């Protein structure tokens, strides 16, 4: 019984983690409110690939990655 609960708990957290990543990748790019000019990557769901945008440094959303590789790993499902 304990092992069943442990497996169920692990599966639940995997599902929540996957759903969270999926939702993150569906968000539009968001430059934020800062005045900086950092090149970042976001997943463009329409184009099905990671693209660059200029991030202001403050705020924004979670569809914001330091590298294209990070963006591809989280969102592109192997085709990037």
Swiss-Prot record:
<keyword id="KW-0732">Signal</keyword>
<feature type="domain" description="BPTI/Kunitz inhibitor">
    <location>
        <begin position="25"/>
        <end position="75"/>
    </location>
</feature>
<dbReference type="GO" id="GO:0044562">
    <property type="term" value="P:envenomation resulting in negative regulation of voltage-gated potassium channel activity in another organism"/>
</dbReference>
<comment type="function">
    <text>Serine protease inhibitor that inhibits trypsin at a molar ratio of 1:1 (Ki=160 nM). Is thermostable.</text>
</comment>
<dbReference type="GO" id="GO:0005615">
    <property type="term" value="C:extracellular space"/>
</dbReference>
<dbReference type="Pfam" id="PF00014">
    <property type="entry name" value="Kunitz_BPTI"/>
</dbReference>
<dbReference type="GO" id="GO:0015459">
    <property type="term" value="F:potassium channel regulator activity"/>
</dbReference>
<keyword id="KW-0646">Protease inhibitor</keyword>
<comment type="similarity">
    <text>Belongs to the venom Kunitz-type family. Scorpion delta-Ktx subfamily. Delta-Ktx 2 sub-subfamily.</text>
</comment>
<dbReference type="GO" id="GO:0005576">
    <property type="term" value="C:extracellular region"/>
</dbReference>
<feature type="signal peptide">
    <location>
        <begin position="1"/>
        <end position="21"/>
    </location>
</feature>
<dbReference type="GO" id="GO:0090729">
    <property type="term" value="F:toxin activity"/>
</dbReference>
<dbReference type="InterPro" id="IPR050098">
    <property type="entry name" value="TFPI/VKTCI-like"/>
</dbReference>
<keyword id="KW-1015">Disulfide bond</keyword>
<dbReference type="GO" id="GO:0004867">
    <property type="term" value="F:serine-type endopeptidase inhibitor activity"/>
</dbReference>
<keyword id="KW-0722">Serine protease inhibitor</keyword>
<protein>
    <recommendedName>
        <fullName>Kunitz-type serine protease inhibitor LmKTT-1b</fullName>
    </recommendedName>
</protein>
<dbReference type="InterPro" id="IPR036880">
    <property type="entry name" value="Kunitz_BPTI_sf"/>
</dbReference>
<feature type="disulfide bond">
    <location>
        <begin position="72"/>
        <end position="80"/>
    </location>
</feature>
<feature type="site" description="Key residue that directly interacts with the S1 pocket of trypsin">
    <location>
        <position position="35"/>
    </location>
</feature>
<keyword id="KW-0964">Secreted</keyword>
<feature type="disulfide bond">
    <location>
        <begin position="50"/>
        <end position="71"/>
    </location>
</feature>
<feature type="disulfide bond">
    <location>
        <begin position="25"/>
        <end position="75"/>
    </location>
</feature>
<dbReference type="GO" id="GO:0033644">
    <property type="term" value="C:host cell membrane"/>
</dbReference>
<dbReference type="InterPro" id="IPR002223">
    <property type="entry name" value="Kunitz_BPTI"/>
</dbReference>
């Amino acid at each position: 019984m304990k092992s069943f609960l442990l497996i169920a708990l692990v599966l639940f957290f995997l599902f929540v983690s996957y759903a969270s990543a999926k939702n993150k990748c569906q968000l539009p790019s968001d430059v934020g409110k800062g005045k900086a000019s950092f090149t970042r990557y976001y997943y463009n769901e329409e184009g099905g690939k990671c693209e660059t945008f200029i991030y202001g440094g403050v705020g924004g959303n979670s569809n914001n990655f330091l590298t294209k590789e990070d963006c591809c790993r989280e969102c592109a499902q192997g085709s990037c």
